[in-house]
C-alpha cells in the first residue's frame, strides 16, 4: 500500500476472515486516512495493538478460512463503493470502514488522519511555514 500512496493512487482495503468482513478505508493519498492512520489510532486506543497486528500479518495468503457467503457479500459491498467512486460520488468508506459482522449486520466506523502519520506530509497544502526564531 505504501507504493500506491507514494504514486498518489487511490486504493481501498477489503478483507474477510474468521466471520468478519471489512470494506475500507478508501484512501485518497494525502487527503484521507490511510491504513497507517488506522494502525496508529488503534495503537493509541490499545497499547497491545502492535502485537495483535503482528500476529494477524503472519498468515500466508489463503491460510485463514472465510465463509463463501461472507466473501461474496464483502466483494459486493466493495464493488458498490468502488463504482460509486469511479462515477464521482462520495463514499462513506473514505475516512471510514464498514465491518460486516457474523450476524450480517453492518457496523460503520469513522477514522481521521492521524497527526503522527507520514501520509499527510506528502500533501503540500498541509505544510506550515515556521518563522525562524530571532534574537531581540
Tell where the protein language model's regions lie, with residue ranges.
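Glycine-rich phosphate/adenylate-binding loop
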Residues: 1-136
